[in-house]
């Protein structure tokens, strides 16, 4: 079976090629200073009561699930999630494979701009260049995604340095011990285990059960993909996950609040 992540990354590199330009840390720091400070993504993932934080994802479709909620309004979905008690939002901005747009992110952060506390928003995309970090900050994101397997170490460092200069957190995504080692080499503060193998898009919660216990205690642990029930959430919480990132199950849920409560139940 062809490696889907290779296909996606090749498309993403072609897509952003016309936008690539030098982006300095000074420029990003000035951008950060000129914009309202976004809420902290990292802080939202450690709940004071010790229950799982829930990152609720806005995702219209995916290569694994196909159409999930075609034509869904990002703002309306974000309102539903916020009312349901989501701790943070993940907003797909990839159009080709996931049906999202950068405007979705901007629209959602604008919607909550005057609320206190506003939900922190992750720009969920296939990041390859600091210009995408600048876009994320301009759109009001609190964090970006860094997929370790998809990038070389120089690209990871460039993205992470850009995120820090722009005042953004970074969620490092890993799927294997070697990727975890690389994330830790870059001093990642937030690491997510993607239970879905992005090569073939199959999920296995045993990945979180294997990798999260290897995280240093000061790293925020996130379990991503394959979380559909309270039992799933309890499995990953039991091995040290601070948060779960859930898309498909919440997009389809008739009552997101009930499902989020189920995820948090001990």
From Swiss-Prot:
Cited CDD domains: IGPS
Keyword entries, A-Z: Amino-acid biosynthesis, Aromatic amino acid biosynthesis, Decarboxylase, Lyase, Tryptophan biosynthesis
Top-level taxon in the UniProt lineage: Bacteria
InterPro entries reported for this sequence: Aldolase_TIM (IPR013785), Indole-3-glycerol_P_synth (IPR045186), Indole-3-glycerol_P_synth_dom (IPR013798), Indole-3-GlycerolPSynthase_CS (IPR001468), RibuloseP-bd_barrel (IPR011060)
Listed GO biological process terms: L-tryptophan biosynthetic process
Catalytic activity reported: 1-(2-carboxyphenylamino)-1-deoxy-D-ribulose 5-phosphate + H(+) = (1S,2R)-1-C-(indol-3-yl)glycerol 3-phosphate + CO2 + H2O
EC number of this enzyme: 4.1.1.48
Pathway(s): Amino-acid biosynthesis; L-tryptophan biosynthesis; L-tryptophan from chorismate: step 4/5
MF terms (GO), sorted A to Z: indole-3-glycerol-phosphate synthase activity; phosphoribosylanthranilate isomerase activity
UniProt-listed Pfam families: IGPS (PF00218)
HAMAP family: IGPS_B
Family, per entry: Belongs to the TrpC family.
UniProt-recorded name of the protein: Indole-3-glycerol phosphate synthase
Top-level taxonomy: Bacteria, Pseudomonadati, Verrucomicrobiota, Opitutia, Opitutales
Gene transcribed to yield this protein: trpC
């Amino acid at each position: 079976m062809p490696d889907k992540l290779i296909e996606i990354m090749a498309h993403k590199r072609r897509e952003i090629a016309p936008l690539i330009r030098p982006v300095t840390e000074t420029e990003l720091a000035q951008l950060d200073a000129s914009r309202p400070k976004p809420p902290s993504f990292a802080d939202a993932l450690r709940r004071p009561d010790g229950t799982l934080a829930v990152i609720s994802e806005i995702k219209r479709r995916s290569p694994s699930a196909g159409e999930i909620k075609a034509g869904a309004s990002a703002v309306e979905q974000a309102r539903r999630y916020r009312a349901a008690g989501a701790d943070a939002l993940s907003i797909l901005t990839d159009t080709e494979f996931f049906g999202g747009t950068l405007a979705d992110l901007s629209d959602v952060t604008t919607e909550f701009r005057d609320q206190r506390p506003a939900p922190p928003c992750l720009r969920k995309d296939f990041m390859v260049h600091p210009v995408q970090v600048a876009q994320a900050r301009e759109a009001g994101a609190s964090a970006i995604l860094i997929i370790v397997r998809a990038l070389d170490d120089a690209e990871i460092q460039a993205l992470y340095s850009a995120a820090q200069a722009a005042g953004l957190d970074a969620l490092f995504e890993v799927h294997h011990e070697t990727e975890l080692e690389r994330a830790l080499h870059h001093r990642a503060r937030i690491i997510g285990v993607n239970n879905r193998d992005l090569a073939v898009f199959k999920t296995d919660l045993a990945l979180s059960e294997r990798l999260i216990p290897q995280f240093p205690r000061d790293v925020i642990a996130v379990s991503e993909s394959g979380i559909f029930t309270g039992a799933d959430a309890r499995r990953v919480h039991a091995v040290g996950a601070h948060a779960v990132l859930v898309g498909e199950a919440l997009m389809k849920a008739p009552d997101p609040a009930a499902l989020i409560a189920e995820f948090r139940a001990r």
